[in-house]
């Protein structure tokens, strides 16, 4: 029963939030005018910056939750590393985006926020869910995103950022997969 209500609530939040998400992407502070330097970034580059920022916020929020909820020292150590590393990358991404006249998101996407809410409701099995969803799945998505950007983004500075950040994300993914094996073995 609770899961059914959760699904309905998440579905409603996604449906009703779509319109506000679109409005949030318009530059209201400048009276609807897009700064001239933003016009230099093509939609693919802006999309990469948006997705990368949201991904980082997802991983940081999930990792902060893991620090609070997990009893597993290895999970907490991984979570702290994710917070530290993603905070640095997030600052670099924000500075780069702003230098291009683009304001990156300051929080995860609505869908990612729903995933975080569902993760936060878990007590039993939290560690496995965190490692699976934030450690492995989110990093697989991030690696794909940065690999694509490192090949296809036209802006040379944004492309370089993707190239330089990719090895760290690949290391995070490998560490998450190793942790996943350990956590899965302990949960059996």
Residue ranges and their predicted role:
Residues 2-12, 16-188:
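His/Met- and acidic-residue-enriched segments that coordinate or traffic transition-metal cofactors
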């Amino acid at each position: 029963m609770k899961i059914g209500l959760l699904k309905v609530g998440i579905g409603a939040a996604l449906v009703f939030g779509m319109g506000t998400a679109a409005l949030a992407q318009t530059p209201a502070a400048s009276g609807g005018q897009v700064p001239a330097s933003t016009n230099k970034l093509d939609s693919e580059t802006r999309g990469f910056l948006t997705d990368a920022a949201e991904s980082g916020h997802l991983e940081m929020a999930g990792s902060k939750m893991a620090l609070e909820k997990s009893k597993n020292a290895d999970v907490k150590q991984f979570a702290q590393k994710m917070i530290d590393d993603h905070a640095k990358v997030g600052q670099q991404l924000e500075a780069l985006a702003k230098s291009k006249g683009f304001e990156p998101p300051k929080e995860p996407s609505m869908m990612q926020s729903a995933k975080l809410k569902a993760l936060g409701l878990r007590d039993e099995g939290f560690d496995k869910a965190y490692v699976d969803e934030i450690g492995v799945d989110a990093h697989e998505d991030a690696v794909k995103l940065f690999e694509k950007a490192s090949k296809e983004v036209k802006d040379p500075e944004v492309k370089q950022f993707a190239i330089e950040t990719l090895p760290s994300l690949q290391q995070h993914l490998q560490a998450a997969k190793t942790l996943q094996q350990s956590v899965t073995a302990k949960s059996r």
